[in-house]
Curated annotation (Swiss-Prot):
InterPro entries: BUG, Bug_dom1, TAT_signal. One of its GO terms (cellular component) is periplasmic space. Residues 1-30 form the signal peptide. Keywords: Periplasm, Signal. It holds the Pfam family TctC. Belongs to the UPF0065 (bug) family. The keyword Zinc does not apply. The keyword Ribonucleoprotein does not apply. It comes from Cupriavidus necator (Alcaligenes eutrophus). It is found in: Periplasm. Predicted to be exported by the Tat system. The position of the signal peptide cleavage has not been experimentally proven. This is UPF0065 protein in gbd 5'region.
Amino acid sequence: MQRRHFIARAGIAAATAALGLAAMPAQAQADKFPQRPIRLVIGYTAGGSTDIPFRVLADNASKILGQPVIVENKPGAGGVLPAQMMQSTAPDGYTLAQVAMPVYRLPYTTKINWDPVKDLNYIINLAGYSFGLVVPADSPIKTMQEYIAYAKANPGKLTYGSPGSMTTLHLTMEELAMKQGVQFSHIPYKGNSESMQALLGGHVMSVADTPAWAPYVEQGKLRLLSTWGEKRSARFPSVPTLKELGIGIVQTSPFGLVAPKGTDPKIVQKLHDAFKKAMDMPNYRESLAKFDMEPYYMNSQQYAQFAAETVKKEKAIIEKLGLAKAQ
């Protein structure tokens, strides 16, 4: 009998110890994180305006965290593949993903079994792109106000090019049309090189794009009507923003970092703090400036709120345009 009691007590003690040990590793992992290299997956090709600043950021973060942060390129599908990866990635903080704006459109354009708001753990927003609207230098349209006036006087006749249908540039131009009560005619191109040549060749009246237009503006071949950031471009300080013109649009297609759902909050906080320090270093700002970009910081809570609000806004625009796909 005594032996049975001893065995029972020993079994209870072992079970209790096992429970304690099960809880301890998670706590210890969070406290000692990171203990091995971190993968940072981005949705665009190597050598571009997204990739190059990310590599500077990763190098900065490596020095802060004491472990290598390795950038991995996973291009395709409009930049959404890294976020998709997070749905099957262990929530241990060792694989992170860049989130691009097209991720927020997925519920309305593609059949998916996950939620971009609920099924990603938002860490930090890092930066945004520079966008603007250009016309040929010899266009009779000389200001943004004249651009809108022309569209009102000529419904559906004012054409604009973008890098493609359902891109941020396309949807922002349609948001602009909705806000101003006008109708544009959209011409999608395969990229900014193609759209620039179409504009310079007189095949389209205007183009909304990233600063592929910048050298042509500086050469006097194109006229920049507006930029879309929170404040004026340092490179083109005489050009107004849509916001200051009273149009009420700020669009920089912000992007940042996420971890898989279920990642320990302590690990998320460590990652946030490290990448915040990394993005505050001068070399990161300099790497962005080469592409007319600037840091755009949001903490974890702000970034998650931004994601929730953006998903709702994208839904309204996509449904208004009749572009939503049946799920």
